[in-house]
Amino acid sequence: MKTLIVFNHPHEGSFCRAILEAVQHGLKESGQQSGLIHLDKDGFDPVMHAKDLKAFALAGKGFPEALDEVDPLVRKYKTKLEQTEHLVLIFPIWWMNMPAMMKGFIDKVIFPAIAYDMKGGLLKSRLPIKKVTVISTMNTPAEVYREHFNNALEGNLIKGTFRQIGIEEVEWVSLSMVKQAPQEERE
């Protein structure tokens, strides 16, 4: 199985970075082929510019050549996604949602003519992705995130994005209170 990890955290010493290294080690040990998109190191621009929005509209209407106008990194990421069966996203939760770079990745890459087609008002995945695993860290207690913030990420990303385009196997691993965790637990 080809696994692609999309990682977003600017601090090299972060808990997310330790998770990334553990996931990469586990994949290597099990002999699985994997790749990495490191949004921070790539200098990914999360902003949906006017040319991106125009390409989005045209691609959604059946003009895939509109993708020639989008950010070259988006086209590079498209190629990687087309070879992916298991997508893993790793990022922190800031202000109850994913950081801007990860949100920009979703906005600009999970895009008509890249990730899905629109037919009769329904979205259908174009990608070979069979499973998505989302690993997030936060300092908010899990019950507070669930009860007071309605599991915002589940509605936005799990149901509102991946399941909506037809990827049914989506797992969310939410690690809460990470700053308060003892060092041995973090390792």
Go through each PLM region and give its residues.
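N-terminal beta1-alpha1-beta2 submodule of the flavodoxin-like/Rossmannoid cofactor-binding fold
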Residues: 1-114, 180-187
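A short small-residue
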Residues: 1-4, 136-139, 173-179
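Residues at the starts of beta-strands that form the adenosine-phosphate
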Residues: 2, 33-35, 130-132, 168-169
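Structural signal for conserved beta-strand scaffold positions within catalytic alpha/beta enzyme cores
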Residues: 36-38, 134, 172-174
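Glycine-rich phosphate/pyrophosphate-binding loop and the adjoining helix
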Residues: 65, 144-187
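Structured loop/turn residues at beta-strand edges in well-structured enzyme cores
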Residues: 82, 100, 127-130, 168
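Short, structured loop/turn "capping" segments at alpha-beta junctions
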Residues: 112, 116, 167-170
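Short, glycine-/small-residue-rich phosphate/pyrophosphate-handling segment
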Residues: 116-163
